[in-house]
């Protein structure tokens, strides 16, 4: 089994468990897959990088959260969540905002 398979299975299982959620949630998961985010992130457990829900909780009260998360995705970051740096990800302009909004929506998971 590929090392990528298990995180992808976890993401898809979480999506199935939330099948009644709005279409935006499915769009977020598609973007996670498109940009291979599941290689280091899952919805609710640390996996190399922080979980998406931990990221959302961290930025929950930050009025600049959208811009900061977008900048971290595009430029990468290091040291904020542990020893592994996050490389920059070439997310398209049209995908960036929906991806960031989806991540930040996960404060209740």
Each predicted region: which residue ranges?
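N-terminal secretory signal peptides that target proteins for export/translocation
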Residues: 1-3
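Sec-dependent N-terminal signal peptides
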Residues: 5-14
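Electrostatic cytochrome c docking/interface patches
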Residues: 16-32, 58
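Sec-exported extracytoplasmic/periplasmic mature domains
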Residues: 33, 57-60, 74-78, 104-108
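The canonical Cys-X-X-Cys-His
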Residues: 34-43, 99
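Axial heme c-ligation environment in periplasmic c-type cytochrome domains
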Residues: 50-57, 74-100
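Short microdomains enriched in Cys/His and/or Lys/Arg
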Residues: 58-69
């Amino acid at each position: 089994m590929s090392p990528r398979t298990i995180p992808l299975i976890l993401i898809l299982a979480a999506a199935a468990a939330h099948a009644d959620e709005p279409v935006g949630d499915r769009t977020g998961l598609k973007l996670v897959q498109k940009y291979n985010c599941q290689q280091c992130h899952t919805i609710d457990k640390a996996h190399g990088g922080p979980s998406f829900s931990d990221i959302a909780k961290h930025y929950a009260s930050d009025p600049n959260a959208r811009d900061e998360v977008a900048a971290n995705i595009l430029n990468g970051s290091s040291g904020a969540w542990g020893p592994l740096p996050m490389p920059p990800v070439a997310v398209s302009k049209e995908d960036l905002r929906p991806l960031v909004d989806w991540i930040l929506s996960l404060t209740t998971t």
